[in-house]
Amino acid sequence: MLFIVRRPKPIREAPCKYLIAGGLMFIAYEASISLSIGLATTNAQSVEVSLVNYLWPTLLVLMTAAVSRKHGAVVKAIPGAIVATIGVAMAVGGESLSVQEAVSNIDSNPLPFALALAGAFIWAIYATFTPSLSEGYDGTTIFFCCVAVVLWTIHFASGDGLPATAPGIGGYAALLACAISISGGYACWGYGMLHGNMETLAIGSYATPLFSTASSTLLLGVALGMPFWIGVALVVAGSLINLWFARRS
């Protein structure tokens, strides 16, 4: 699908250091996130692992501030980052989020949380530093092909084969819809990284977990509770704080 949405330039035009560094980070991120969700043993752990993964917008905001070379940029980014991160936790975790239960789950099953945290750092580093290595080349499509190979290899190496029964028309339709949304999202993100303002893009990335949670609840037919809307308000407030400080800098 990405070859349709974002056909890459000939690979010979890509800087070697970008292909190696960017490709390894992209694959590592996708693999770590996929494995972290797969290794979660309960619904509560899945939510908590997602929350750890959604630290990447905060890390991205702080990293882009750090490399901007603006005086006091990191310190000025912290207040908005804290407010927005609390908002993300409320929006994604909702009323079911329990700090005590989360600590217990981390203690009993630390690997998925470690993978999710590693993924958050990897993606923030990838988004911050690969644009300067790319020289305008967008390797998202190539990287995703490599991700597919790695994930299928992990799948078969774990002993799982192909599904016993083929999905119906509804399953294929859902698969196509997911492919379109994911490929479109990554294509837009890759274009924004190369041609947009990274500080603004980083701040805007706080909307990612909100849209993800909202779409999930709508697909499952679950009503969005008050914690979600409070979280949205906090994310908006934190983003505006970051934008205000960024423009003043």
Model-derived segments and spans:
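Cytoplasmic-side transmembrane-helix entry/capping segments in multi-pass membrane proteins
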Residues: A14-G23, G72-T85, E135-C145, T200-I203
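Hydrophobic/small/kink-forming positions within alpha-helical transmembrane segments
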Residues: G23-I27, A31, P57-L62, A89, ...
